[in-house]
């Protein structure tokens, strides 16, 4: 379900502060975040965020096309190993 327009995008408060600190310092460092639910804002373009996937932080470089999406969309939480091999084919 889509969020109401009048509410505006959701972003955790600490995230804006972290992004501003990195921009002010001028260093290109990974900003570790656990807030997968936060919306990517235009201020975040050009920064690299380490989005937690439940196990480790996945580095996500924010580009123009990502604005409006959620951080969690770019750090998958599940690993697909493929379906099991056919047992009949193995025996032959």
UniProtKB/Swiss-Prot annotation:
GO molecular function term, any single one: structural constituent of ribosome
One GO cellular component term: small ribosomal subunit
Annotated GO biological process: ribosomal small subunit assembly; translation
Matching InterPro entries: Ribosomal_uS19 (IPR002222), Ribosomal_uS19_bac-type (IPR005732), Ribosomal_uS19_CS (IPR020934), Ribosomal_uS19_SF (IPR023575)
Keywords: Ribonucleoprotein, Ribosomal protein, RNA-binding, rRNA-binding
Keyword GTP-binding found: no
Domain of life: Bacteria
One Pfam family, short name: Ribosomal_S19
Keyword tRNA processing: no
Record-linked HAMAP family: Ribosomal_uS19 (MF_00531)
Entries under PANTHER family matching the protein: RIBOSOMAL PROTEIN S19P FAMILY MEMBER, SMALL RIBOSOMAL SUBUNIT PROTEIN US19M
Task of the protein: Protein S19 forms a complex with S13 that binds strongly to the 16S ribosomal RNA.
Protein family according to the UniProt entry: Belongs to the universal ribosomal protein uS19 family.
Protein name per UniProt: Small ribosomal subunit protein uS19
Species assigned in the record: Bartonella bacilliformis (strain ATCC 35685 / KC583 / Herrer 020/F12,63)
């Amino acid at each position: 379900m889509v969020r109401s327009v009048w509410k505006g995008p959701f972003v955790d408060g600490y995230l804006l502060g972290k992004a501003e600190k990195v921009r002010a310092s001028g260093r290109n460092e990974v900003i570790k975040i656990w807030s997968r639910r936060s919306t990517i804002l235009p201020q975040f373009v050009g920064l690299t965020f380490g989005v937690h996937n439940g196990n480790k932080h996945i580095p996500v470089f924010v580009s123009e096309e990502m604005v409006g999406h959620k951080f969690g969309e770019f750090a998958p939480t599940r690993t697909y190993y493929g379906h099991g091999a056919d047992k009949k084919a193995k025996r032959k």
